[in-house]
Amino acid sequence: MALLAEHLLKPLPADRQIETGPFLEAVAHLPPFFDCLGSPVFTPIKADISGNITKIKAVYDTDPAKFKTLQNILEVEKGMYGAEWPKVGATLALLWLKRGLRFIQVFLQSICDGERDENHPNLIRVNANKAYEMALKKYHGWLVQKIFKAALYAAPYKSDFLKALSKGQNVTEEECLEKIRLFLVNYTATIDAIYDMYTKMNAELDYTV
């Protein structure tokens, strides 16, 4: 669980504003999560998350004060790009980043909730499929969906996944799950706040890739 426990997200303030710098610093450590899934077919999601973090950081670094929060980024870019917004800039990068982060959240929550294939309880295919269905599938065309369906069958055993997530540390499954639950508290609240922000600002897009 070391991979997640070392980089917990900050609790949200009352106004649910997410500070850009600390957010990017925390999520920058998440792409290796996909290495724990074993299959190289998950590499595109990993690369997508890394690439979108880089794009948002490039905008943030131009003026950290102006782009102090994620909402600041959307508001400034809305005024800057006009009719092209929200399909441009860091707004578009964050749109896709939140989907990749939601995949991780739904997947981990499903494992913590004990959802599984009763005939194959040590497989994480059920969890990965739920995460894909909820976070990414509707934004993928037929070909990409087919590729990911194949990837789900290559997902590792739960025991191997948790061991990889723990970076080889000798911890029990329950200890690992407890650390995942701790990680998910602020992580889930943050992802929910980003989704709500996109809805309120009418910045959500439904096109497929």
From Swiss-Prot:
Keywords noted in UniProt: Acetylation, Cytoplasm, Lipid transport, Repeat, Transport
Signal peptide: none
Transmembrane segments: none
One cellular-component annotation, GO: cytosol
Pfam families the UniProt entry points to: GLTP
Spans annotated as 2 X 12 AA approximate tandem repeats: 45-66
Residues the entry annotates as binding beta-D-galactosyl-(1->4)-beta-D-glucosyl-(1<->1)-N-[(9Z)-octadecenoyl]-sphing-4-enine: 48-55, 140, 207
Residue ranges of Sequence repeats: 45-55, 56-66
GO molecular function terms listed in the Swiss-Prot or TrEMBL record: glycolipid binding; identical protein binding; lipid binding; lipid transfer activity
Gene3D superfamilies listed in its UniProt record: Glycolipid transfer protein (1.10.3520.10)
Keyword Ribonucleoprotein: no
Domain of life of the source: Eukaryota
Function: Accelerates the intermembrane transfer of various glycolipids. Catalyzes the transfer of various glycosphingolipids between membranes but does not catalyze the transfer of phospholipids. May be involved in the intracellular translocation of glucosylceramides.
Subunit record text: Monomer.
Protein's UniProt name: Glycolipid transfer protein
Source organism: Mus musculus
Source lineage: Eukaryota, Metazoa, Chordata, Craniata, Vertebrata
Gene: Gltp
